[in-house]
Amino acid sequence: MLLIPAIDLKDGQCVRLKQGDMDQATVFSEDPAAMARHWVDQGARRLHLVDLNGAFVGKPRNEAAIKAIIAEVGSEIPVQLGGGIRDLNTIERWLDDGLSYVIIGTAAVKNPGFLQDACTAFGGHIIVGLDARDGKVATDGWSKLTGHEVVDLARKYEDYGVESIIYTDIGRDGMLQGINIDATVKLAQSVSIPVIASGGLSSLKDIDHLCAVESEGVEGVICGRAIYSGDLNFREAQDHADKLGAA
């Protein structure tokens, strides 16, 4: 089970939001590259970056911070980025700059043809981000709710060659209420694409639940507020997951 620290970027700073609300941002660091180094030193094997400003405006906005993170740790572990990625040129530029994976969210929902083109051009590097509230997919920085069911969209993407799906339960994001295991497993069982859980991780108990369903196709989890607030020690959590995986 891969535990992936999240670094959410707003105005060049590392922040955490509650339920995607930009007005409820807590600043955890003004040096995102140093934060990236911290997580690598704590044993992270991949990093998850989100350009929050970019997600809302539809184009990259925290480029300096992202490039600084890639320069700091990109040669050591894979780095993935989501937020504001809506065209092939942006994907190519980020991959050339050293990102390992690019996450397509809103654009995948609104323009499936773009996602298909991206998977064809950059096979093995494209992750889809499906963000949902009560089972319905949300777009545009979670500000717009669609009528699409998560599982229906995921099945559609299966033939495109998507590397994995990050499934976020918006209602639990930043709330430390625990992962929505049932919805995550339902999605993982419905498709052959590996699923990464996101939203609500709060304790080693969540890690236990996730490791128990790893064989269903849940390959990892994004770690957010809990590792910043101190509710969860990242190194301890990854070690715990490794021991369960080896058992």
UniProtKB/Swiss-Prot annotation:
State whether keyword Methyltransferase applies: no
The entry's active site is: 8, 131
Q: In which pathway does it act?
A: Amino-acid biosynthesis; L-histidine biosynthesis; L-histidine from 5-phospho-alpha-D-ribose 1-diphosphate: step 4/9
Tell me where in or outside the cell this protein is found. Cytoplasm
One Pfam family named in its UniProt record = His_biosynth
Q: Does the entry feature the keyword Cytoplasm, yes or no?
A: yes
Query: Which SUPFAM superfamilies has this protein been placed in?
Result: Ribulose-phoshate binding barrel (SSF51366)
Q: Which Gene3D superfamilies match?
A: Aldolase class I (3.20.20.70)
Chief location of this protein within or outside the cell: cytoplasm
Q: Which GO terms describe its biological process?
A: L-histidine biosynthetic process; L-tryptophan biosynthetic process
Q: Name one GO cellular component term.
A: cytoplasm
Q: Which GO terms describe its molecular function?
A: 1-(5-phosphoribosyl)-5-[(5-phosphoribosylamino)methylideneamino]imidazole-4-carboxamide isomerase activity
- Under Enzyme Commission nomenclature, its number is 5.3.1.16
Q: Which chemical reaction does it catalyze?
A: 1-(5-phospho-beta-D-ribosyl)-5-[(5-phospho-beta-D-ribosylamino)methylideneamino]imidazole-4-carboxamide = 5-[(5-phospho-1-deoxy-D-ribulos-1-ylimino)methylamino]-1-(5-phospho-beta-D-ribosyl)imidazole-4-carboxamide
InterPro entries according to UniProt: Aldolase_TIM, His_biosynth, HisA_bact_arch, Isoase_HisA-like, Isoase_HisA-like_bact, RibuloseP-bd_barrel
Which UniProt keywords are present, listed alphabetically? Amino-acid biosynthesis, Cytoplasm, Histidine biosynthesis, Isomerase
HAMAP family in the record: HisA
* Family the entry assigns: Belongs to the HisA/HisF family.
Descriptive protein name: 1-(5-phosphoribosyl)-5-[(5-phosphoribosylamino)methylideneamino] imidazole-4-carboxamide isomerase
Organism classification, top ranks? Bacteria, Pseudomonadati, Pseudomonadota, Betaproteobacteria, Burkholderiales
